[in-house]
A protein has these predicted regions:
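Phosphate- and other anionic-substrate recognition elements at nucleic-acid/protein interfaces
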Residues: 1-181
Length: 181
């Protein structure tokens, strides 16, 4: 009989470089996280702005070009994207956000990068323990998790980092409830 084989303990997996995106037609927040042990490191965070006076097609182009620059510089392995959230009160907002999401999905596909969608409540619950956390609570949770000296501003950037963190932690779980887009 052969002696028992001892297998090494399973190593936690990490999702590689994650690009978190908070889509918007006026401002699209983004955050790039890279693995570093159990806690990721923030490599870059910012806002891609479109010019409100331009035609819709030009604004979408501006978002796409800005996002392509981020892809070229950081080569993310996954995009974590906030799902569309809309109440019946503001259908126009959801429609405008859909244009930004469309170009985000296009740029990700062009760069052969999978996109995973997360509902806002899912992100809030994972980071703060409450699906009803406010913007300030999200900013503080992101600051703490990434060990930043200051909170990330504006909210679009903090939200993008929160979405990336949600993916970073969810991707390590056996049953990730996220939706591949």
């Amino acid at each position: 009989m052969n002696p028992p084989v001892t297998l090494p303990p399973p190593q936690p997996t990490h999702p590689g470089v994650v690009l978190g995106i908070d889509p918007g037609l006026n401002r699209t927040g983004y955050a790039v996280l890279a693995p570093r042990g159990r806690t990721p490191i923030l490599r870059e965070a910012g806002v891609i702005r479109s010019t409100p006076k331009l035609a819709l097609s030009e604004r979408v182009r501006e978002i796409g070009e800005g996002l392509q620059e981020v892809f070229e510089q950081y080569r993310p392995e996954t995009v974590a994207l906030e799902q569309v959230f809309s109440t019946g009160q503001f259908p126009q907002s959801a429609l405008l956000m859909a244009h930004a999401r469309g170009v985000i999905l296009f740029i990700a596909a062009r760069n052969l990068c999978p996109v995973i969608g997360y509902a806002p409540r899912q992100v809030k619950r994972l980071l703060t323990g409450s699906g009803k956390a406010d913007k300030r609570q999200i900013q503080l949770a992101v600051q703490s998790e990434l060990r930043l000296a200051q909170i990330l501003e504006p909210n679009d950037v903090a939200d993008a980092a929160a979405i990336a963190l949600c993916h970073y932690h969810s991707a390590r779980l056996p049953a990730n409830p996220a939706e591949r887009l």
